[in-house]
C-alpha cells in the first residue's frame, strides 16, 4: 500500500473515531439534562414526559409525612400543588414552608417520584427560576 493511501485511511479512521466520540458525548450530556419546571407547568401538562426533570417551589406547610425512609410532601408555587414521594434521608435544611428543588419523574398516579431533593441553603437565597415562578404564581393567584 502506498504511503498516500495509508495516510488517507488513517485520516478517515480518525474522522470516524472523532464522530463516534462526539455522538457518545452528546448522548451522555443529553441524558443528564434535567429541565426545570414549576408545579403550575406540571399541572398544565408542560412537564417532559418519560424523562427526569426538576420541580422547584416551596414545601407546603403541614404536608410532610414520614413512613420509615419514605417521605411524602407537597411542593407548591402558591398556585398549584404537586404531591412528592422520596425514599431516602432529607437534607438537614429541608423544612415545611421553605424552598426546595426536587429532581425525579412523574408516575401514572400524578405523584412526583423524587430521586434527589435539594433544600434552600440560605435564608435569603432562591434560584432565579424559582423566584420568578413564585412571583408569577402570586400575580396569577391574586388576579383571580
Swiss-Prot record:
Subcellular location(s) per record: Cell inner membrane
Main location as per UniProt: membrane
Disulfide bonds: none
Cytoplasmic compartment residues: 1-7
Regions of this protein lying in the Periplasmic compartment: 29-144
Lineage: superkingdom: Bacteria
One Gene Ontology term from the biological process aspect of the record: cytochrome complex assembly
GO annotations of cellular component type: plasma membrane
Membrane topology: Single-pass type II membrane protein
Region forming the signal peptide: none
GO-annotated molecular function: heme binding; metal ion binding
Keywords assigned by UniProt, alphabetized: Cell inner membrane, Cell membrane, Cytochrome c-type biogenesis, Heme, Iron, Membrane, Metal-binding, Signal-anchor, Transmembrane, Transmembrane helix
Spans through the membrane: 8-28
Gene3D superfamilies tied to this protein: Nucleic acid-binding proteins (2.40.50.140)
Residues that, per the record, bind heme: 121, 125
Function: Heme chaperone required for the biogenesis of c-type cytochromes. Transiently binds heme delivered by CcmC and transfers the heme to apo-cytochromes in a process facilitated by CcmF and CcmH.
Membership in a protein family: Belongs to the CcmE/CycJ family.
Protein name per its UniProtKB record: Cytochrome c-type biogenesis protein CcmE
Lineage: Bacteria, Pseudomonadati, Pseudomonadota, Betaproteobacteria, Burkholderiales
Amino acid at each position: 500500500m502506498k504511503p498516500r493511501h495509508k495516510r488517507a485511511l488513517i485520516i478517515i479512521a480518525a474522522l470516524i473515531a472523532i464522530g463516534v466520540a462526539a455522538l457518545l458525548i452528546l448522548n451522555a450530556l443529553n441524558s443528564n439534562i434535567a429541565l426545570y419546571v414549576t408545579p403550575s407547568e406540571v399541572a398544565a401538562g408542560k412537564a417532559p414526559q418519560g424523562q427526569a426533570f426538576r420541580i422547584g417551589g416551596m414545601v407546603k406547610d403541614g404536608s410532610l409525612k414520614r413512613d420509615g425512609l419514605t417521605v411524602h410532601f407537597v411542593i407548591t408555587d402558591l398556585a398549584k400543588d404537586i404531591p412528592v414521594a422520596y425514599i431516602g434521608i432529607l437534607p438537614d435544611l429541608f423544612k415545611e414552608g421553605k424552598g426546595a428543588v426536587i429532581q425525579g419523574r412523574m408516575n401514572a398516579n400524578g405523584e412526583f417520584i423524587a430521586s434527589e431533593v435539594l433544600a434552600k441553603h440560605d435564608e435569603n437565597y432562591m434560584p432565579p427560576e424559582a423566584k420568578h415562578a413564585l412571583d408569577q404564581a402570586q400575580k396569577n393567584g391574586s388576579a383571580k
